[in-house]
């Protein structure tokens, strides 16, 4: 039986006892999947996981998304994004967002593995967009229900290219903007699996609201 410790009333659960060095059986995979649907974000503390095991775990949820159009990848694993922040490459994202909403098909989930973390700071924060919707007054729910948002690669366009960017990074951004263009999505949507209503817009990728 899967051991899940609830973190907050709205979001988050810690799962213990998973050994990523061995294949995860189907029953455990299914339990993790349903824990993710229930808690929306789940954590595996002090888990030792290789890039190969990372991909194998991702495949247990379905087909892995194509390589990220902008960020570099882990050597030998093009489907794993490598994010490295230091004094030369400071963080370029500091805004609430849902990953890749500019794509035609939004990914089901993202799996993050922290390899090196600072003693202070460096936090990644999560929020529940369904809990945020539930707390809106009824007149605001009705108002937002008639609106749509146009999503594009705005955050990358605005923050990824800087004076220190290479010609290669600028070209990758250019190619990705042409490739993905824009996608129009309702501000309020229902999750296709859980049926929960949630807010699907964010300052990182929404160009404007119509």
Language model region names:
Residues 2-210:
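Non-heme Fe(II) oxygenase catalytic core, chiefly the N-lobe of the double-stranded beta-helix
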């Amino acid at each position: 039986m899967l051991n899940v410790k609830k973190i907050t009333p709205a979001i988050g659960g810690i799962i213990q006892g998973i050994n990523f060095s061995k294949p995860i059986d189907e029953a455990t995979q299914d339990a993790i999947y349903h824990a993710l649907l229930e808690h929306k974000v789940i954590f595996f503390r002090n888990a030792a996981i290789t890039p190969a095991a990372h991909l194998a775990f991702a495949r247990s949820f379905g087909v892995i998304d194509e390589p990220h159009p902008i960020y570099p990848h882990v050597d030998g694993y093009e489907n794993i994004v490598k994010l490295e922040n230091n004094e030369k490459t400071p963080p370029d994202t500091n805004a609430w967002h849902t990953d890749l909403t500019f794509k035609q098909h939004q990914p089901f989930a993202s799996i993050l593995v922290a390899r090196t973390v600072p003693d202070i700071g460096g936090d990644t924060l999560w929020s529940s967009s369904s809990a945020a919707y539930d707390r809106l007054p009824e007149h605001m729910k009705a108002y937002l229900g008639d609106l749509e948002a146009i999503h594009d690669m705005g955050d990358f366009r605005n923050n990824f290219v800087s004076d220190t960017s290479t010609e290669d990074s600028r070209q990758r951004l250019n190619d990705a903007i042409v490739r993905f263009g824009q996608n129009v999505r309702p501000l309020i949507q229902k999750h296709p699996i859980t049926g929960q209503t949630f807010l699907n817009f964010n300052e990182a990728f929404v160009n404007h609201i119509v």
